[in-house]
Swiss-Prot record:
InterPro entries: Ribosomal_bL12 (IPR000206), Ribosomal_bL12_C (IPR013823), Ribosomal_bL12_C/ClpS-like (IPR014719), Ribosomal_bL12_oligo (IPR008932), Ribosomal_bL12_oligo_N_sf (IPR036235). Homodimer. Part of the ribosomal stalk of the 50S ribosomal subunit. Forms a multimeric L10(L12)X complex, where L10 forms an elongated spine to which 2 to 4 L12 dimers bind in a sequential fashion. Binds GTP-bound translation factors. GO terms for molecular function: mRNA binding; structural constituent of ribosome. SUPFAM superfamilies: ClpS-like (SSF54736), Ribosomal protein L7/12, oligomerisation (N-terminal) domain (SSF48300). This is Large ribosomal subunit protein bL12. Belongs to the bacterial ribosomal protein bL12 family. The keyword Ribonucleoprotein applies. One of its GO terms (cellular component) is cytosolic large ribosomal subunit.
Length: 123
C-alpha cells in the first residue's frame, strides 16, 4: 500500500506538461488512446444530454489592469480602431473586443491582451 501512495504522491507533483508527456508515453507503451477511454466512459451519459462544443467565441475585455497604454495598443492592433475609440473601449471595460471568432483565434487574442496586462474572458 505504501508503494501506491508513493505513486500517487509522485503523480500529484507533476506539472501539466509532465503529465501530458506521461500520458503520451503510456499510450505508446500500452497501445491505447486516452481519448478513446474518455469517449467510452462518457457514452452512458451521452444519451441523457448531448452538449455541443462551442465553436464561436466573443473575446471580452474584463479590465485593462495596470498597463492601460499597452492594452490600448493591443486593442488598436486587434480591432483596427483609432486611438480615441480604442481608449474609450478600454476605459469602458467590460466590453467585447471581437465577436464570432473560432477557439484558436480567441485563445490567441486572449493571450495577446493578457500579455499586455489586461484581464480577458472568452464567452
Amino acid at each position: 500500500m505504501a508503494d501506491l501512495q508513493k505513486i500517487v504522491d509522485d503523480l500529484s507533483s507533476l506539472t501539466v506538461l509532465e503529465a501530458a508527456e506521461l500520458a503520451k508515453l503510456l499510450e505508446e507503451k500500452w497501445g491505447v488512446s486516452a481519448a478513446a477511454a474518455v469517449a467510452v466512459a462518457a457514452a452512458p451519459g451521452a444519451a441523457a444530454a448531448a452538449v455541443e462544443e462551442k465553436t464561436e467565441f466573443t473575446v471580452v475585455l474584463a479590465s485593462a489592469g495596470d498597463k492601460k497604454i499597452e492594452v490600448i495598443k493591443e486593442v488598436r492592433a486587434i480591432t483596427g480602431l483609432g486611438l480615441k475609440e480604442a481608449k474609450d473601449l478600454v476605459e469602458g471595460a467590460p466590453k467585447p473586443i471581437k465577436e464570432g471568432v473560432n477557439k484558436d483565434e480567441a485563445e490567441k487574442l486572449k493571450a495577446q491582451l493578457e500579455k499586455a496586462g489586461a484581464k480577458v474572458e472568452l464567452k
